[in-house]
C-alpha cells in the first residue's frame, strides 16, 4: 500500500512539473 502511495505522489509531482 505504501509503494502505491509513493507512486501516486511521484505521478502527481510529474504532472505538476509538466503544468508548470
Curated annotation (Swiss-Prot):
It comes from Papio sp. (Baboon). GO terms for molecular function: metal ion binding; oxidoreductase activity, acting on paired donors, with incorporation or reduction of molecular oxygen, reduced flavin or flavoprotein as one donor, and incorporation of one atom of oxygen. It is an enzyme of class 1 (oxidoreductase). Disulfide bonds: none annotated. It comes from the Eukaryota. It catalyses: an organic molecule + reduced [NADPH--hemoprotein reductase] + O2 = an alcohol + oxidized [NADPH--hemoprotein reductase] + H2O + H(+). This is Cytochrome P450 2A7. It is a peripheral membrane protein. The keyword Membrane applies. It is found in: Endoplasmic reticulum membrane; Microsome membrane. Induction: By phenobarbital. GO terms for cellular component: endoplasmic reticulum membrane.
Amino acid at each position: 500500500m505504501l509503494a502505491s502511495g509513493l507512486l501516486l505522489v511521484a505521478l502527481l509531482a510529474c504532472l505538476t512539473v509538466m503544468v508548470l
